[in-house]
Amino acid sequence: ILCPQMSPFHFGILQAAFNTCGYHLEVLPNDNKHAVDVGLKYVNNDACYPSLMVVGQVMDALLSGKYDLNKTAVIMSQTGGGCRASNYIAFIRRALKKTGMEQVPVISTNLSGLESNPGFKLTLPLIKRVCYGAVFGDILMKCVYRMRPYEVEEGIVNRKHKIWEQRVISFLTGSSVSHSQFKKMCHEMVHEFDMIPITGEKKPRVGIVGEILVKFLPAANNHLAELLEAEGAEAVCPDLIDFINYCFYNQNFKCEFLGFKKNKATIANWGIKAIEWLRKPMNEALAQSRHFTPSANIADLAKMAEPIVSPGNQTGEGWFLTGEMME
């Protein structure tokens, strides 16, 4: 199963989670300019940049001759909103049709019931590992961006990142993935980064806010975090899990003003509660540290955005971007 790259901090970890649960997932390493050029052959150039990047990655891989097309599938997340995140699947299928590769199935991972996928099931062990992996990815991203601009010993933060990434992968690929061990690792990870010797200087902090793929994928934002660090600033990037909370939180407005069934909001709010419970060890560890701050609450982000833009402004991550800017 081929998966386009979106966030290097998270997707290597998530690949291990999928592979432990009986799938052979490969996160594509071809997130580069060539992938964009390939994407332009199959997606009209008035489609957004992320869709060119993703379709390009998929088609570049399938056309490479490396994979047996009769034993290969493509996986893509689908949010169910009005934006390209719902239309990727159609973009990819159209590109496959144009090149005579219609036998390659495109798997949609969605919670909105947009598509069902025979042969692909989100099981409890897989969901558990993916959730833990996403939290670990967020911690690593926070810690690396916060500490790297100030490190006394050059390269120590990146080395620490690689060590912890391997520890996380070993944990997620083990036979027993316990919540107590997850909590312990959250605290240990934050503590180890917190203890890295840093210079006492104060640099400008620059928030990176934008569409999800452009925000998290260095190849899509011209390696913005590295550029900011080279120019003497500290990059701050919001959590990936916040986006999932945003998708859940939107159901409240839809039920109140757009005639959606009330139980949708109830289920979504339970989803937010579950995510906050899952993130609790991370936020506790961050709150106890010297250099890090806990993650924002999605309801607080919505309140911050409300004086500027309505929570009904949801397509293209509408009010969420404003909330992140304010936060």
Residue map of PLM features:
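An N-terminal assembly and electron-transfer interface module characteristic of large anaerobic redox
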Residues: 1-327
